[in-house]
Amino acid sequence: MTGPPGRSDDLNALLRQIARGERDAFAMFYDHTCTRVYGLVARVLRDAGYSEETTQEIYLEVWRTASDYDATKGSPLAWLLTMAHRRAVDRVRAEQAGSQRESRYGAANVDLASDVVADSAIAGDERRRVVECLDGLTDTQRQCIELAYYGGLTYAEVSQRLATNLSTIKSRMRDALRGLRNCLDAS
């Protein structure tokens, strides 16, 4: 191969070779792309162990589906990073679903002595405070918070839904969370 590692033409050729089952091509493809894939996955998952495991799953999928790659639909790196992002987000969702299942099971199977009336009053007060603080945000900040936290969307999905740049969404979320924290701390 000629040119710098990771060039689209080089990766294209490697994917064709991987589709034919050539292990050396797979090793070269991995060497050229693993840093970017792992970096993307680690940013989404924020856990080294899960990131390594997910990266391994992604490359296993590359080995199995290299023949499905269509060069007319995008570059090999875009195909790979899209696959990586989807797999990482799926992992986040699976972990969240597992945690929620465990929480529901634990809540349903633990009988704690508690004052139901007091707990209900406290929960109602907390809900009221959160609603008041949400009302103090700008409409765009509130919309971002609602989509991400109540709608379960990732920042990228919020960006797509609102047709707004991802960095703008991140800024709005940061400002909104800071505003909520300040409001809740003050009340």
From Swiss-Prot:
Q: Give the location of motif Interaction with polymerase core subunit RpoC in residue numbers.
A: 53-56
* CDD domains registered for this protein in UniProt: Sigma70_r4
Q: Name one Pfam family in it.
A: Sigma70_r4
The region called Sigma-70 factor domain-2 is annotated at: 30-96
Q: Which UniProt keywords apply?
A: DNA-binding, Sigma factor, Transcription, Transcription regulation
Q: Name one GO biological process term.
A: DNA-templated transcription initiation
* Primary role: Sigma factors are initiation factors that promote the attachment of RNA polymerase to specific initiation sites and are then released. Extracytoplasmic function (ECF) sigma factors are held in an inactive form by an anti-sigma factor until released by regulated intramembrane proteolysis.
Written domain comment of the UniProt record: The sigma-70 factor domain-2 mediates sequence-specific interaction with the -10 element in promoter DNA, and plays an important role in melting the double-stranded DNA and the formation of the transcription bubble. The sigma-70 factor domain-2 mediates interaction with the RNA polymerase subunits RpoB and RpoC. The sigma-70 factor domain-4 contains a helix-turn-helix (H-T-H) motif that mediates interaction with the -35 element in promoter DNA. The domain also mediates interaction with the RNA polymerase subunit RpoA. Interactions between sigma-70 factor domain-4 and anti-sigma factors prevents interaction of sigma factors with the RNA polymerase catalytic core.
Q: What else is known?
A: Extracytoplasmic function (ECF) sigma factors are held in an inactive form by an anti-sigma factor until released by regulated intramembrane proteolysis (RIP). RIP occurs when an extracytoplasmic signal triggers a concerted proteolytic cascade to transmit information and elicit cellular responses. The membrane-spanning anti-sigma factor is first cut extracytoplasmically (site-1 protease, S1P), then within the membrane itself (site-2 protease, S2P, Rip1), while cytoplasmic proteases finish degrading the regulatory protein, liberating SigK.
Indicate what this protein is called per its UniProt record.
Answer: ECF RNA polymerase sigma factor SigK
